[in-house]
Every structure is written in structure tokens, then in C-alpha cells.
């Protein structure tokens, strides 16, 4: 009731500004400001330049961006496939089985991602499945880390589905496979695209597990940012970070547009 009054709305906006600006907006604005600077003296950056961005979109930085895009795309598609399959399977299980499956998929989220990276490194550093030193081990680790979010998103969407559509299709003689591909999955499409976008964004920003696994020829952009700032190249690292943020945001906006179109079908 408080927010419906004029004073309540002003208080809500004031609280939002008080929390949003120092916690979210200002740190990002500082990174953007640093990306255009050559040095920082006093309270503000100085020496404005665009050379940091010129370096951020060529050479090793461009290769790292491509690596991140390929890794995130592959991991999000794999996570979406596995998470959707698990969510559909869990919907047919009893309560205890569903809880067990949910807990199994949430396990990688419950532990630090560096632990997941170590587990993948130990598990796949020897035959018969030797992935250490390849790009596949990075994609696998990212898939493990983001599958839980795909599983939870699709599971929540399945619970909200009206069973009348499936029942109507089945009563007309449609086979289970046809009902799945032509009825159920199209109804889940908005949730599937949202889950894919979330998995993509999480994969694009993953660092801890990646640091333990990436080979020299498969360095994702977050690792590139870390190594740049670790060497003292704070301003060029900030430019690369802005490129990472912008790329992820553009992909999320595209996914949101696809989801909106799917919702109106």
C-alpha cells in the first residue's frame, strides 16, 4: 500500500537509487571510464584515448572473444539439451525421484566453480577419456556449471504448462513423440530461449574453473581480462571487459527478442 502513495513511490525510487548506484552502476561506470584512459590521477581518469578499444578488438583479444563466443554457444546448447531432457524426465517421476534429480543437477552450483574445474581436470586427464589440453574440457566444464540453470528454468515452465493441450492431442491419436515435438516443446519455447540466454551469459563470464583448464590456444575472454590486469594493464583490461559486457548484452537482447516473438505465437 505504501508504494501506491506519492510519498511511497518517491521513497521506493530513492531506495532503489541508493542501492543501485553504489552497488551496480558506479562500478560499471568506473570500468567504462578506465577503458578510455591512459592513466588515473586523482578522483577521475585522465589521458582520454580510444587505443585501448583498438587493441581490444584485434589480435589476441579478438581471438579470446571468438573463443568465449564458441565456448558459450556450445555450452549453452549442450546444457539446454541435457537440462530439458532431465526436466522432461523428472516430470514423470515421483516426488522422491524428482527431488533426487533436482539435487543432482544443483550439485555443481552448490560447490565453488574452482572445485568443479578441479574435478573435471582430474577425471579427464587420463585415458580412456583424455580431454586435458583441449578445448573440449573447457566446454565440458562450462556445460556442467550452467546445466543446473537450464534444468531449473525448464522444470519451472513444465509445472506451469496446461496439461489440456497434451491430453487433447493424445485423444486425437497423436503419438507421444509427436505430442512432445509438436505440442509440448513449442509451448516451452519461450522458457527454452530464456534458459539458453542465461546459460550463455553465465558461460561468457566464467573464470574460476576456466583458469584451471584452458589450454594456451583456447583462452576465453575473462582469462584474457585477468591476465591483462594481473600484468598491470588495467586500462586495456577495462576495455576488453567492456567489450565482454557489450557482447553479452547484445546476445541477451537478441535472445529476449526471440523469446518475445515465441510468446506471441
Regions found by a protein language model. Give the residues of each.
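Gly/Ser/Thr-rich beta-alpha loop segments that engage phosphate groups in nucleotides
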Residues: 85, 175, 217
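Glycine/proline-centered hinge or cleavage motifs at structural transition points of membrane proteins
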Residues: 172-174, 186
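Short hydrophobic, aromatic-rich alpha-helical segments embedded in or entering the lipid bilayer
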Residues: 44-57, 216-230
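Membrane-water interface segments at the C-terminal ends of transmembrane alpha-helices
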Residues: 8-41, 54-159, 183, 187, ...
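Short cytosolic juxtamembrane segments of multi-pass membrane proteins
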Residues: 1-2, 258-265
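Transmembrane helix boundary and interhelical loop/hinge segments in multi-pass membrane proteins
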Residues: 36, 46-49, 157-167, 176-178, ...
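Hydrophobic positions on the alpha-helical face of helix-turn-helix-like DNA-binding modules
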Residues: 168-169, 179, 183, 225
